[in-house]
């Protein structure tokens, strides 16, 4: 029953539910010969077509039905980006069950907590994760059986995992005569949990309708701009926010899909980019660091790679400039979150921006960007009053839209909405053209003498220094100012830079009082399950750090 008033005169259009199964049916019918290429855990390259994917997805759906999986049941996966994982995406959701992607980079205790909280019925996993599943299986109370994604001859002779089945046996033992059911498009389709950097992870439960609307919007020219002419390699994991929706939006267009499997090092990625003529990719900044280092160290170039979307955390401007100016790769800076399916904004230029000087255009592209249709946003102060869009005033960022959650799974956290808007936890500015720029996570903002200091700008400036590989900025207690910035730096291999040189590097680039009070050098920044820097770990490490100004 709709919550909105019903007109006395309704449109006379066909009523067809927006269901995930319609995407793979469309891909098979109209792009059936187009390729899906995967580097497998087994080590080889696997090739087949959208037609093959649809056929095997239906077989898997029939097998799951035979195991007693019903509409609304949760079926978990723990797998890399690959063809079998794609089949599970469509088989589970297409049958009316709920696909629950598990992040293997979480702590085992968190994985057990999530499977129990989701009440998963089955877990489909890849050979890489056999030891992990053997360790946690006894703590997963609701799982009835485990399905191992591997060739038949790779099945373990014995295992402590109860009711362990072979994925390929299930596929081979069922016919491809399964018919995708029709049901309400608002039915749950997928379940993704937050990374849980503080407290237990919380679940975001997507619907078929929200997923298809997100897929439509994300393929638009001023969003991800995916087309049938592309060869797409998603580096962002399928176990993290559904790989930003690419397993849906790419088949929707019929583009070639290339999956990297477990090999995400610079050389492996580069080799696959070149061999499969990849034109478009997507991933977090830390992944591109490894790829760019490999390319630079071996004096290589890209022959077909022309466009990438970078998100998950703010992309350093120095990286954007390297990709754009040195390698001719268009970088689309994007922003979103698990609670948003995840896409919210993309930084692409409007027509009048091309009249601006090059530096001004670059500044626009460094922002998180403009909303895609379907998403609305605003910034508010701590009282909830809306703040101006002047590009200077920063406030708490709120969003709403048809692919934004209304609550967490099972009501965790209570009523999360603020007057119908979802509070993102980000602090941002919005300029007169509607371009949003994250200045910080609200929990990461440094509060110094009653004023806010955003850490992202400080980190980006540091990473533009040639000797700095990575940087993170945190607030450290100060007897007079409450908090002051401490810059934590990882140097590039074989290069040196002093604290004094780095602090001097800020001169003229920011307000003087924003300049960090101290610099600490470490070997590596702690990285979390989704590729983001774990600032809570850094804060814990430097909790007792005494600033020279204290």
What function would you assign to each model-found segment?
Residues 64-70, 174-187, 191-233, 245, ...:
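Conserved adenylate-forming
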Residues 23-24, 66-67, 94-169, 183, ...:
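Structural core segment of the AMP-binding/adenylate-forming
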Residues 106, 112, 123-127, 281, ...:
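AMP-binding/adenylate-forming catalytic core of the ANL superfamily
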Residues 36-82, 86-90, 107-112, 166-169:
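Conserved AMP-binding/adenylate-forming core of the ANL superfamily
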């Amino acid at each position: 029953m709709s919550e909105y008033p019903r007109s006395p005169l309704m449109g006379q259009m066909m009523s067809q539910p927006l269901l995930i199964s319609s995407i793979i049916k469309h891909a098979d019918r109209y792009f059936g010969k187009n390729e899906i290429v995967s580097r497998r855990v087994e080590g080889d390259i696997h090739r087949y077509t959208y037609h093959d994917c649809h056929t095997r997805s239906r077989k898997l759906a029939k097998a799951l039905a035979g195991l007693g999986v019903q509409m609304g049941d949760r079926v978990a996966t723990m797998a890399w980006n690959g063809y079998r994982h794609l089949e599970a995406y469509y088989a589970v959701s297409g049958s009316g069950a709920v696909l629950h992607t598990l992040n293997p980079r979480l702590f085992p205790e968190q994985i057990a907590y999530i499977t129990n909280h989701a009440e998963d019925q089955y877990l489909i996993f890849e050979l890489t994760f056999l030891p992990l599943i053997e360790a946690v299986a006894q703590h997963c109370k609701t799982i009835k059986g485990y399905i191992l994604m591997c060739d038949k001859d790779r099945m373990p002779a014995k295992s402590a995992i109860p009711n362990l089945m072979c994925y390929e046996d299930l596929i081979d033992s069922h016919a491809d005569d399964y018919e995708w059911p029709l049901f309400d498009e608002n039915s749950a389709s997928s379940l993704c949990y937050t990374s849980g950097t503080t407290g237990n992870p919380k679940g975001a439960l997507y619907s078929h309708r929200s997923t298809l609307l997100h897929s439509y919007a994300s393929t638009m020219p001023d969003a991800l701009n995916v087309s049938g002419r592309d060869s797409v390699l998603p580096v962002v994991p399928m176990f993290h926010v559904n790989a930003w929706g690419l397993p849906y939006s790419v088949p929707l267009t019929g583009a070639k899909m290339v999956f990297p499997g477990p090999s995400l090092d610079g050389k492996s990625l580069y080799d696959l980019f070149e061999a499969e003529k990849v034109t478009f990719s997507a991933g977090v900044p830390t992944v591109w660091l490894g790829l760019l280092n490999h390319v630079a160290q071996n004096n290589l170039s890209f022959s077909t790679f022309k466009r990438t979307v970078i998100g998950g955390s703010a992309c350093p401007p120095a990286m954007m400039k390297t990709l754009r100016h040195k390698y001719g790769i268009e970088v689309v800076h994007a922003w979103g979150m698990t609670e948003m399916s995840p896409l919210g904004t993309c930084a692409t230029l409007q027509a009048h921006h091309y009249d601006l000087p090059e530096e001004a255009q670059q500044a626009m592209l460094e922002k998180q960007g403009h909303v895609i249709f379907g998403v609305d946003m605003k910034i508010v102060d701590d009282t909830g009053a809306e703040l101006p869009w002047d590009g200077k005033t920063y406030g708490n960022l709120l969003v709403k839209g048809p692919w934004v959650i209304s609550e967490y799974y099972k009501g965790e956290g209570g009523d999360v909405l603020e007057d119908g808007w979802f509070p993102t936890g980000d602090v941002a500015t919005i300029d007169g053209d509607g371009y949003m720029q994250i200045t910080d996570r609200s929990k990461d903002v440094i509060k110094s003498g009653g004023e806010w200091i955003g850490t992202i700008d400080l980190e980006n400036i540091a990473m533009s220094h040639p000797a700095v590989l990575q940087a993170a900025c945190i607030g450290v207690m100060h007897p007079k100012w409450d908090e002051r910035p401490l810059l934590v730096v990882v140097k590039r291999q074989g290069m040196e830079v002093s604290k004094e040189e780095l602090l001097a590097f800020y001169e003229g680039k920011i307000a003087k009082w924003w300049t960090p009070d101290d610099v600490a050098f470490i070997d590596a920044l702690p990285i979390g399950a989704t590729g983001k820097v774990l600032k809570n770990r850094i804060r814990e490490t430097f909790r007792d750090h005494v600033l020279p100004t204290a």
